């Protein structure tokens, strides 16, 4: 039956495996009378018994590798059949954890349950998933919980394997009552239960503390996060908008009391905001293994180019609750940023990409970034931003230096000062 399933490709691999097995046996016990082989045999015979056993072990390891590759191809589980290979979407480890996440993820802030319809949300998730994205991020506060409801409904409707997804949510603002907000043990446990009900999931892969809470002792926060992980409600936990000192304190408390430390920090990162991700988080990564999941690669749409001639009516900055964004755009600093974006346009044209694609690829060129969360309100925007994957190989050191010379905002680490 197994032979029947292999087909022509399986037979060929089986033949290669058989040949390699014969070669291994031949080299281990037979003699070749050709001058070249004879000299090699003399050389082999001069090896000590331990040396010969090491050679034999290497041959057997190679044989096992060939047979394993043959079996994986037979089961369509080889590297050529993985989602990363077939879609071209690179995957990276989340910090120093073993969790593999697509280097681009889809966020739901503002869009799901607010700026877009449920139908558009489904279309966006479908495009992302079929493009190799496995990371979907939300929060209990997004659209007062509606974003989680929409995200969970789409996952259930699509029938995607839960094991193929990385779902993350964030806790802090759960309701109007004092006990429904913050990072108390009560709200972390009850808030996550509420999120799981809205998502229609048994667990999330990562639960984030959406901001620091000065009213709750760090030990209580870490104990509560450890508890929800031990209860199977989450796989990992992380922080969002925490300072490096606060993250380090959480790690120290976790190690002191044999609890689970955070694996990731969610931080804003784009062409005009760099210091935390480029200076502070790399130190934390090397010291305690905390990775970076970044958001707002287009600076809430500022880098998209849509605000070059003012604020369009359909844009995010035109919404009542985003007057702060409008003020930022029309400010003196905002006008300077728009001028810098115009100077970056020739670089994008030379690389054959759009300015948003250049901006996202610029974020990805930082190997310390585990994943960049995209926020799109239309399928066209999402497809354009996903195209940054093709631009990433073009982000050479020369191109990065060109961008730095225009931005003139590169932060300096302690290492730079020492050098």
Swiss-Prot record:
Protein's job: Regulatory subunit of the voltage-gated potassium (Kv) channels composed of pore-forming and potassium-conducting alpha subunits and of regulatory beta subunits. The beta-1/KCNAB1 cytoplasmic subunit mediates closure of delayed rectifier potassium channels by physically obstructing the pore via its N-terminal domain and increases the speed of channel closure for other family members. Promotes the inactivation of KCNA1, KCNA2, KCNA4, KCNA5 and KCNA6 alpha subunit-containing channels.
An example Gene Ontology biological process: regulation of potassium ion transmembrane transport
A GO molecular-function descriptor: NADPH binding
Enzymatic reactions: a primary alcohol + NADP(+) = an aldehyde + NADPH + H(+); a secondary alcohol + NADP(+) = a ketone + NADPH + H(+)
Location of the active site: 142
Biased composition, class Basic and acidic residues, residue ranges: 30-43
SUPFAM superfamilies linked: NAD(P)-linked oxidoreductase
Tissue and organ expression note: Detected in portal vein myocytes (at protein level).
Taxonomy, superkingdom: Eukaryota
EC number: 1.1.1.-
Entry-linked InterPro entries: K_chnl_volt-dep_bsu_KCNAB, K_chnl_volt-dep_bsu_KCNAB-rel, K_chnl_volt-dep_bsu_KCNAB1, NADP_OxRdtase_dom, NADP_OxRdtase_dom_sf
Quaternary data: Homotetramer. Interaction with tetrameric potassium channel alpha subunits gives rise to a heterooctamer. Identified in potassium channel complexes containing KCNA1, KCNA2, KCNA4, KCNA5, KCNA6, KCNAB1 and KCNAB2. Part of a complex containing KCNA1, KCNA4 and LGI1; interaction with LGI1 inhibits down-regulation of KCNA1 channel activity. Interacts with the dimer formed by GNB1 and GNG2; this enhances KCNA1 binding. Interacts with SQSTM1.
Full protein name: Voltage-gated potassium channel subunit beta-1
Chain spans, region Disordered: 1-51
Organism, as annotated: Oryctolagus cuniculus
Domain notes: The N-terminal domain of the beta subunit mediates closure of delayed rectifier potassium channels by physically obstructing the pore.
Keywords: Cell membrane, Cytoplasm, Ion transport, Membrane, NADP, Oxidoreductase, Potassium, Potassium transport, Transport
């Amino acid at each position: 039956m197994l032979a029947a399933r292999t087909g022509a490709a399986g037979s060929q691999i089986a033949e290669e495996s058989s040949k390699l097995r014969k070669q291994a046996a031949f080299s281990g016990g037979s003699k070749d009378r050709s001058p070249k082989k004879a000299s090699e045999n003399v050389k082999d015979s001069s090896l000590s018994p331990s040396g010969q056993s090491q050679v034999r072990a290497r041959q057997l390891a190679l044989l096992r590798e060939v047979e394993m590759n043959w079996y994986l191809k037979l089961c369509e589980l080889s590297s050529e059949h993985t989602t990363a290979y077939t879609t071209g979407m690179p995957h990276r480890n989340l910090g120093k954890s073993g969790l593999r996440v697509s280097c681009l993820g889809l966020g739901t802030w503002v869009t799901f349950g607010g700026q877009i319809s449920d139908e558009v949300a489904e279309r966006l998730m479908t495009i992302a998933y079929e493009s190799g994205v496995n990371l979907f991020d939300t929060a209990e506060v997004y659209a007062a919980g509606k974003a989680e409801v929409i995200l969970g409904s789409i996952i259930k409707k699509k029938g995607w394997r839960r094991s193929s997804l990385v779902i993350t949510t964030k806790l802090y603002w759960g309701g109007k009552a004092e006990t429904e907000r913050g990072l108390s043990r009560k709200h972390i446990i009850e808030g996550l239960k509420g999120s799981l009900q809205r998502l229609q999931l048994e667990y999330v892969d990562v639960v984030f503390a959406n901001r620091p809470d000065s009213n709750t002792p760090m030990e209580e926060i870490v104990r509560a996060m450890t508890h929800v992980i031990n209860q199977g409600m989450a796989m990992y936990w992380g922080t969002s908008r925490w300072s490096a000192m606060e993250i380090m304190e959480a790690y120290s408390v976790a190690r002191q009391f044999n609890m689970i430390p955070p694996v990731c920090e969610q931080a804003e990162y784009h062409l005009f905001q760099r210091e935390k991700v480029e200076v502070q988080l790399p130190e934390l990564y090397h010291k305690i293994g905390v990775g970076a999941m970044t958001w707002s690669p287009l600076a809430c749409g500022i880098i998209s180019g849509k605000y070059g001639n003012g604020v369009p009516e359909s844009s995010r900055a035109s919404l009542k609750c985003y007057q702060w964004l409008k003020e930022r755009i029309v400010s003196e600093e905002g006008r300077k940023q728009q001028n810098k974006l115009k100077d970056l346009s020739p670089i994008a044209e030379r690389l054959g990409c759009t300015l948003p694609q250049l901006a996202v690829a610029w974020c990805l060129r930082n190997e310390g970034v585990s994943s960049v969360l995209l926020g799109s309100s239309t399928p066209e925007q999402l497809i354009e931003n996903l195209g940054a994957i093709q631009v990433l190989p073009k982000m050479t050191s020369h191109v990065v230096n060109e961008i730095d010379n225009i931005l003139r905002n590169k932060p300096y680490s302690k290492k730079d000062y020492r050098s």
